[in-house]
From Swiss-Prot:
Taxonomy, superkingdom: Eukaryota
Signal peptide: 1-20
S-S bonds: 75-110
Subunit structure: Heterodimer of a light and a heavy chain, probably disulfide-linked.
UniProtKB keywords: Amidation, Antibiotic, Antimicrobial, Bromination, Disulfide bond, Fungicide, Signal
GO BP of this protein: defense response to fungus; defense response to Gram-negative bacterium; defense response to Gram-positive bacterium; killing of cells of another organism
Modification 6'-bromotryptophan occurs at: 52-53
Organism: Echinus esculentus (Sea urchin)
Name this protein carries in UniProt: Centrocin 1
Propeptide span(s): 21-50, 81-104
Residue(s) carrying Asparagine amide: 117
Amino acid sequence: MMIKIAVVLCAVMATTMVRAKYVEEQELADLLDLLISEEVSSPDDAVALQGWWRRTVDKVRNAGRKVAGFASKACGALGHSPQEARAKVLEAFPEMKEADLDEEDIGKYCGYAHALNGR
């Protein structure tokens, strides 16, 4: 069980370090060492671990919301339809080839951004 938790935390650590750069690496490494050595035996350690986990999840969630909000605003500025967005991007960047911009991809990314942002 502890190995599964350690693997999940490794994935969380990698995501957190990419998304929320203000999390200290040493804090993450200490937690992973604690899990691998199976020293989480006292109730105090478990409470500390739960508190750290909640803070980490909140930081990742907030970073994701910021990214989704930014992407949603950018899609809104470009236009709500994929055709409008594609036309505006090509207008802003004339050196870009039309084949590089697929309307389906633009629509899909804008749809994801709007869905994550709650619009």
